[in-house]
Amino acid sequence: MRERLMGLEVEYGCLVRDASLGRPEQVVELLKDYAFNDLQIGLVDRHARDFAFEPAQAGGFLTNGGRLYIDAVGDHLEYATPEVTRLDDLVAHDRAGQRTLLRLVDGALSRDAVSFHNNSIDHFGGHTFGCHENYAVSIPSDSLRVALTSVVSFLVSRLIYAGAGRVGGHRLTRGSPRDLARQGHRVLDTLWVGDVYGVEADPGVRYQLSQRADHIRHAMSGRVRFNRAIINPKSDTFCDLTGEWRLHVLFGESNMSQYATALKVGTTGLVLTLAELGLLSDDTWLARPVASLRRISRDESHRWIVALADGGSISAVDHQRRYLELAQRYLAGCGGDADWVIGEWSRVLDDLEGDPRRLV
């Protein structure tokens, strides 16, 4: 089994307790400048990578190969790991991003005045920010539709062991067509989420598995700022001319557990290998992926029953087992992290079905 390039992008929430420091976007600007100008732990971008969304001086590469930058959509401080091929390296670089952020706060401010949160939801304003995953993939064009639909379905039921969990829920409020039409005069593509729909608390939800499920609107989308989707197939390639491209998983959440991070990325990598080998079929397709995402997230019975595209129904555990069985049959013994992932994947599904408390 070939080594796959992969990486994470983590958007951090910022809470400012000292009003004299200004707004959160001013604080993240201060910390970004402190990282590159004072500590000199990397090289800041001298030229704009994108006129509207990645202007010059917005961030840069760090000495460990990662990136620290201000995400223009929401003004979050974001850390991207270097691209790696091993799960332990990915987990280590993800934790390095957290330690780097704490170092910046301790050096430029104080933890009493400012705190950064490795979560994916803002309980005050209803905003959401993600932990995105990137994978280098090479899927033949004649099997792309089957592969991506199967991968999306996998990512939906993956929630049972990859969700970050949250108290409460949100409801999206749809904007009027007239409000949306008024945005058409803009020269730059700077349409924000708030221009399209609003969000309000959902008092009917006590707890759910996912922090972001309430905010996802599409299975796949190329315009991700207001069409939040599960995946964003990228046409760009930064590797070589062999046909690899970047699969951008938008629906991801920040896991504090390093084990959860390794498992969610590891299982996804195996499913992508199955897709590249043409081993995925439509028997795993979900009828309504976005609705199933919310259903799994909010199901306090832990049965997690979802509808299949063929008219049947299945539990999320058994749905995951369909992918696991393919991995056991075709990828066991292939080297790398495959055997560890397959073993832990099987154990976690057994525990989720038998007694979830064993996973605590």
Where are these regions (language model features)?
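Polysaccharide-binding surfaces and accessory modules of carbohydrate-active proteins
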Residues: 150-205
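Histidine-centered divalent-metal-coordination microenvironment in nucleic-acid enzymes
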Residues: 119-138
